[in-house]
Amino acid sequence: MGTETKSNSYTGQISTSGGNPKVMKDSLSLVRQTVNQQTLSLSQSNQVQNQLNSHSNSNSYPNPSGSENKNENEQNSRDIRAKPEDKSRKEAIVPFVPIFVEEADVIQGAKELLKVIRPTWDLSHVEFKIRVVPQIEDRYPAQNAMVMMTLYSFTDGITNKLVGCFHKEISKLNDENGGSYLPIKTQGLSPVQSEDPVIIEKEDDDEFTDDRAADDGSPVQYSDNVVLVRIYGNKTDLLIDRKAETQNFLLLHTYGLAPSLYATFKNGLVYEYVPGTTLNTDSVLCPEIWPLVARRMAEMHRKVRKHGDSSATKPMPMIWKKTQSFLDLVPERFSDAEKHKRVKETFLPIGRLREEFNKLYEYLEALDSPIVFSHNDLLLGNVIYTQSLNTVNFIDYEYADYNFQAFDIGNHFAEMCGVDEVDYSRYPKREFQLQWLRVYLEEYLQRSNIQNDEVELLYVQVNQFALASHIFWTVWSLLQAEHSTIDFDYVGYAFLRYNEYLARKVEFLSLTAAKNNK
């Protein structure tokens, strides 16, 4: 199919070669010879600290900087793999491995990557856990199923594939929260070994986890024995700036807000795993958990600044530039005739959908919500709860960028309704939102005397920006419907988001900030 354009994620150097190279089984020497140890410059530690004391605008809320968090030391100890900052370190070096991992052969691709980034690992002692699409009952009838406990299924959202690589004894662990890793329908069967491993599907979407405490009460640490390999979905480069994603990964790591990035390859990342359990529509409402999410988001919004940014420069919000870009890419005619028919019968023409978004954006921009560095995709599967540490961490930074504060929160509230089984009756009620937002503001503004007026103002902004979230993911879903190879009904999901936008539009745009109302 012509030539493949290859862009190094760190230098922007471009080269071309014929075709898409497949993973070669005996490519270790080639890979090691061509690993490109490029560098991505990050701010020095003193520059980072200076950036913490600046705020990108002076909008609805006072500048949150200035007062130090009295629990800062405690919080740092709870951050992902938080370590003392090396004052002499100026650059983060991340290897680039020139491998393209085929979606149909992700295990072999993961093995080739491990040969480079974990050369001391004996691959015969490594077990893998990957995402598979078919349901377990469809492929392995219970009455004569023969399964092995080598490969397990879990998901990485609905656009990428994720492979967990577990070295030695890590594979023997059970999930304390969910019991055996064998699905309920196959429990009690004797595991068997086979030259061709059988892949079974886990019934939930939790990360591989083990929160158990050691004898001294500290959490069990297995990160060094686990590597996660993410393979990007088909044509997702149309939606996501992969160089920016890598920069975001490293940036957030310097703040203790992201795990270590071990390497990149042509169509993915290799990184440290985060122990814990992904949230679901029930746990996200638990009083032990939701305040952790609110504070973690506020911490990101308050602290993170890109190197070189200053209060004099107001960044372009992600929601504007990404939505416009996606609208440009949605095809006038879908290549799949059935999808095209469904889209045509369900949605406004793209030109009118753009007009609808532009009018909404003009209204939302006037709300003067602060522009902060945001995650922008806090669906429940991107929030990891570690019970033994009583912490949450966010994963997946594909859409992280500067954006309106209220969008990040409103988007998270909308995601509380689920993805695979969306139920918009789960959208958080007013009283819950007010509690959540008060906790958020305490962390964001670094003070406890939050006024009711401040909470009310943010409540209005958040719900009105939730409308923008619905349009954004509607357009995103239409684009995915054309290009993604993941087995997911993107047209159906777009329909759900767009209908919820229409259902809530008048209600949310009618909101006004009530004063002195708890």
UniProtKB/Swiss-Prot annotation:
Pathway: Phospholipid metabolism; phosphatidylethanolamine biosynthesis; phosphatidylethanolamine from ethanolamine: step 1/3
Low complexity: compositionally biased ranges: 33-68
Coiled coil (residue ranges): none
Disulphide linkage map: none
Region (Disordered): 1-88
Phosphoserine modified-residue sites: 190, 194
EC number assigned by the record: 2.7.1.82
Keyword Lipid biosynthesis assigned: yes
Cellular compartment(s): Cytoplasm
GO molecular function, a single term: choline kinase activity
Gene3D superfamilies: 3.90.1200.10, Phosphorylase Kinase, domain 1
Consequences of knocking out this gene: 'Bang sensitive' phenotype; induction of paralysis with electrical stimulation results in a brief seizure, followed by a failure of the muscles to respond to giant fiber stimulation. This is due to an excitability defect caused by altered membrane phospholipid composition.
Top EC class of this enzyme: transferase
SUPFAM superfamilies: Protein kinase-like (PK-like)
Biased composition (Polar residues): 1-19
Main localization of the protein described in the UniProt heading: cytoplasm
GO biological process, one term: long-term memory
Keywords: ATP-binding, Cytoplasm, Kinase, Lipid biosynthesis, Lipid metabolism, Nucleotide-binding, Phospholipid biosynthesis, Phospholipid metabolism, Phosphoprotein, Transferase
Biased composition annotated in UniProt, kind: Basic and acidic residues: 69-88
Catalytic activity reported: ethanolamine + ATP = phosphoethanolamine + ADP + H(+)
Recorded GO CC terms: cytoplasm
Keyword DNA-binding in annotation: no
Function statement: Highly specific for ethanolamine phosphorylation. May be a rate-controlling step in phosphatidylethanolamine biosynthesis.
Family named by the database record: Belongs to the choline/ethanolamine kinase family.
Protein name (record): Ethanolamine kinase
